[in-house]
């Protein structure tokens, strides 16, 4: 019967690891969604400590620049479709971002962190 207690501990640990990992993920933002020079969605609201993943779409190259937050920015251009940049937000606030090559075309957005 000792193996049942070990099995219970292992199953509980596995469940908690999946649950905690799922809670940290907040949103996926597509860069160049549908071949357009847009972020989709271009506005999201998340909780502090959560992660937003930016995924390069069909129309590269793109980058992500957060005004006043160089530590969150990904200035290198993403050329490969499907390339991802995860960004974790630890402080509440409004974080405006843009794609530098396409900001003039309106490729901008904001993340609200509660």
Feature locations, PLM:
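Extracytoplasmic copper-binding redox domains, predominantly the cupredoxin/blue-copper superfamily
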Residues: 2, 20-114
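Bacterial N-terminal signal peptides
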Residues: 9-19
């Amino acid at each position: 019967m000792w193996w049942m207690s070990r099995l219970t501990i292992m199953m509980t640990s596995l469940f908690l690891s999946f649950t905690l990992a799922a809670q940290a993920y907040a949103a996926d933002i597509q860069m160049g969604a549908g071949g357009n020079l847009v972020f989709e969605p271009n506005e999201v609201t998340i909780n502090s400590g959560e992660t937003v993943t930016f995924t390069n779409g069909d129309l590269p190259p793109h980058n992500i620049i957060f005004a006043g937050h160089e530590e969150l920015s990904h200035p290198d251009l993403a050329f490969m479709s499907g390339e991802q940049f995860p960004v974790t937000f630890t402080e509440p606030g409004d974080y405006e971002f843009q794609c530098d090559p396409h900001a003039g075309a309106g490729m901008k957005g904001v993340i609200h962190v509660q």
